[in-house]
A protein has these predicted regions:
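Flexible, glycine/charged-enriched surface loops at secondary-structure junctions
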Residues: 25-34, 87-93, 225-228
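Short helix-loop capping/hinge segments that flank enzyme active sites or metal/cofactor-binding pockets
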Residues: 2, 49-140, 187-198
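Glycine-rich, small-residue loops and helix-cap segments
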Residues: 10-15, 20, 35, 52, ...
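Short connector loops at secondary-structure junctions
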Residues: 26-54
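Short hydrophobic beta-strand segments
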Residues: 1-6, 40
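Active-site pocket-shaping loop/turn-to-helix segments
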Residues: 4-14, 63-66
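Structured segments of extracytoplasmic/periplasmic soluble domains
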Residues: 17-20, 24-27, 78-86, 98, ...
Length: 229
């Protein structure tokens, strides 16, 4: 179990989820991931100005992962070239140009990340990308989750909501999320019923275990509430 910092109401949801898992026979180990604080460290993020008019952080610098921006352009270009049919869009620059030509339709939330990604070559050859990728794998995989699983003899790690997405996604490790409960407040703002999920993440090729764990918890907790819209 690892969840870092959480608001009190979200902690209460997690506490109930842990009780359910223990009732099912799970053995829970609460332990820190030693390199969790390395994620997003120097050399792994890029400064991008937030120009989204609907964002409370407009005008501030965002720090998206370097690897994400480089791989976004590379992956999207390959998809548009090899798989997209019925469209004139063949690369990211075409998408950016379309958005600029149709601002009311396409730029309601800006395209800061697309513009930042477009500044890269798109072939993953740059030193900045390769260096950031190596640091990500060292922090998230080699000295992170791999060491964590070995040291504590774990089958999976449990994260609240998407709190584990940053570290599990970097080495490409699988995760599955199921409903855990609801809270009435998010970042100090009241919400009617804001859903909180429970994420099960595991090492490479552990999808079969994760699906069994998540299904057993989902059936026992019965926290899924279909949307009413």
């Amino acid at each position: 179990v690892y969840f870092g910092k959480l608001p009190a109401k979200a902690k209460a949801v997690m506490a109930r989820a842990f009780e359910t898992l223990q009732d099912l026979g799970a053995t829970l180990v609460r332990a820190n991931i030693p390199t969790a604080g390395w994620i997003g460290g120097p050399g792994t993020t890029m400064n991008v100005l937030n120009t989204n008019p609907f964002s409370p952080r407009k005008g501030q610098l965002a720090t998206p992962p370097i690897v994400f921006l480089y791989e976004f352009k590379h992956g999207l270009n390959l998809y548009l070239r090899d798989w997209a049919t019925g469209t004139k869009m063949k690369k990211l620059s075409d998408v950016v140009a379309f958005n600029n030509a149709h601002p009311k339709r396409a730029l309601r939330f800006g395209q800061d990340l697309a513009l930042a990604a477009e500044t890269t070559r798109g072939d993953l050859s740059e030193l900045e990308y390769r260096s950031a990728r190596a640091m990500d794998l060292l922090a998230a995989k080699t000295r992170g989750l791999d060491a964590y699983y070995r040291r504590h003899k774990l089958d999976a790690v449990i994260f609240p909501a998407s709190h584990g997405a940053a570290i599990a996604a970097r080495p490409g490790y699988p995760s599955v999320q199921v409903p855990a409960g609801f809270v009435s407040e998010v970042e100090g703002r009241p919400t009617p019923r804001y859903p909180i999920g429970l994420t099960f993440s595991g090492p490479a090729w552990s999808e079969h275990k994760l699906l069994r764990f998540a299904y057993a918890y989902e059936q026992a907790s019965n926290m899924r509430r279909p949307p009413k819209f």
